[in-house]
Amino acid sequence: MTSTAYKLQAEGIHKSYGSNHVLKGVTLTAKAGDVISLIGSSGSGKSTLLRCINLLEKPQQGRIVVAGEELQLKPGRNGELEPVNPKQLQMMRTKLAMVFQHFNLWAHKTVLQNIIEAPVHVLGISKDEAVERARKYLKLVGLEN
């Protein structure tokens, strides 16, 4: 199967914290429509892998391809890989959806404010556009009020 058949390819991902090697050459591929569950004991690297794929954590080695476009990475400090072009990383993140086991909602914010937090602060979408999108999706699931 060619690399363009996959929507996501994470190849040879390595991540260590000091002498603790959490990810040792992990490879994951996903085609359009795939739903993937990572199952393992606490501390086995599930969340670390997801955070490395979207560079919330920086792997020491590996290759990441989203929708046929390879994320351009370069060696950074402490031997971690960093994006060559932050705009490419931002665009890549708009194409990925991940749900972590433990997610945080801010009790002092409304549902709408919680929903627009990531699009505005992680993806760089304008607040107005994020609100418009959020209201559309809230309406789709019957939560517009």
Annotate each PLM feature.
Residues 1-14:
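ABC-family P-loop ATPase nucleotide-binding domain
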Residues 39-41:
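The feature captures the beta-strand-to-loop junction immediately N-terminal to the Walker
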Residues 54:
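Helix-to-loop junction immediately C-terminal to a conserved catalytic motif
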Residues 63-65, 69:
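ATP-binding/catalytic-site motifs of ATP-hydrolyzing domains
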Residues 69-83, 116, 127-145:
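Conserved ABC ATPase "signature" region
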Residues 108-117:
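Short coil-to-helix segment of the ABC ATPase nucleotide-binding domain corresponding to the Q-loop/switch region
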